[in-house]
Regions:
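Active-site metal-coordination/substrate-binding segment of hydrolases
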Residues: 48-130, 140-142
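Short secondary-structure junctions
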Residues: 28-36, 197-202, 360-362
Length: 363
């Protein structure tokens, strides 16, 4: 069996299925106890000390679609051939990794989201740290792996962990070191925020695995920069200098974490605030991606997004792919609500807010 090689070239050219097959052996050889399913791989730390759990997802947009395969008439992804990058598709310099201009036209993206997160976790392990580690599947289509964990499985290592740290943040607000807490109140345990701010810049975000797992396991969460930009597009690239700096920051934070009393650390949700932006609505004030999320859940996706994005089909598809998860977040919350029905977004949002017992406040 070919073993995992912890290089970007190797990780970017592997399928989700290949990683699911190879990673358990990698972890076992480093003294981890491993639980491997079709939905996730959990590596339980060999350390007897309380550990955080590092999280990354194994799929990329290439896992789910080839470039240009969304059918607006059926509102489904096409069944055309998908592609995974090969070594010759990559352009690697001392500073950046991106797709070559001659790369396979079937490729939808580089796949840095979230192979950068996978590599970061492997780098942390190679540096001698032994946190719990969780690799999930199909995050890009609604956090399938993490939803499975919440609804079907009970993972003791997550219950025993000090906090959940995902490495899956791109550049959304102009910084290569962004961190996002989602609906977790970052001020509830101020020492976490104070320490992380030494290495990362606070930003807003929409959704990823830890946004599902944190409330489910009552653990503090954060999603840290993975040093990629333009995810979900063929212009996606990795900033190697930022990657190195962010990994060093994570290692420093993990060292600090080892000396903390984390026994009483819990998940505390932010007070809900709903704002209205034209024809969209958001719980995440100030985030463009939040507005994109809600645009996605309009009844007539094609008309709305084509209007907003001036006929840029590729950008509209990228937004759809980026934002599928919000619907799943509602399901995880045991609410069967949608942000749209046959009427307008605003009407449905009013109903949602009312039924959740919150006050609707137009901005």
């Amino acid at each position: 069996m070919t073993k995992i090689t912890n290089t970007f070239e190797k990780l970017l050219t592997m399928t989700q299925e290949a990683l699911l097959s190879k990673l358990p052996e990698y972890l076992s050889e480093r003294s981890y106890s491993v639980i491997a399913t079709d939905y996730y791989i959990l590596g339980v730390s060999p350390s007897e000390d309380i550990q955080p759990c590092l999280v990354a997802h194994l799929d990329t947009i290439n896992t789910h679609r080839g470039a240009g395969s969304y059918n607006y008439a059926t509102k489904k992804w096409g069944t055309g051939r998908k592609a995974t990058p090969k070594a010759e598709d990559l352009m690697i310099s001392n500073k950046y990794i991106t797709l070559s201009p001659e790369a396979n036209p079937k490729l939808a993206c580089l796949g840095a989201d979230d192979r950068c997160g996978v590599k970061t976790i492997l780098d942390v392990i190679e540096a001698g740290k032994r946190p719990h580690v969780l690799f999930t599947t199909d995050e890009e289509i609604g956090c399938v792996g993490s939803n499975r964990i919440i609804t079907e499985d009970d993972l003791q290592a997550l219950s025993d962990s000090s906090m959940l740290i995902q490495i899956d943040r791109g550049v959304h607000e102009g910084f290569w070191n962004e961190m996002v807490f989602y609906e977790y109140d970052e001020n509830s345990i101020p020492e976490i925020l104070t320490e992380l701010e030494k290495y990362y810049t606070l930003a807003e975000g929409s959704y990823t695995d830890v946004a599902v797992l944190g409330p489910g396991y009552d653990k503090p969460i954060v999603n840290l920069s993975a040093a990629y930009e333009n995810e979900h597009t063929r212009n996606e690239f990795i900033n190697l200098e930022a990657y190195k700096k962010n990994t060093e920051g994570l290692l420093s934070f993990l060292t600090w974490l080892e000396g903390q009393d984390t026994a009483n650390w819990k998940y505390t949700e932010k007070a809900p605030v709903w704002s209205y932006y034209g024809n969209t609505a958001s719980t995440w004030e100030g985030s463009d991606y939040a507005n994109y999320d809600d645009n996605t859940y309009r009844e007539f996706v094609k008309e709305d997004l084509m209007c907003v994005y001036s006929g840029d089909t590729d950008e509209a598809m990228d937004i759809i792919e980026n934002c599928k998860g919000f619907k799943s977040w509602l399901a995880v919350s045991n609410k069967s609500y949608m942000l749209y029905k046959e009427g307008t977004v605003l009407d449905s949002l009013k109903q949602l807010v009312t039924e959740l017992g919150m006050e609707y406040k137009p901005a």
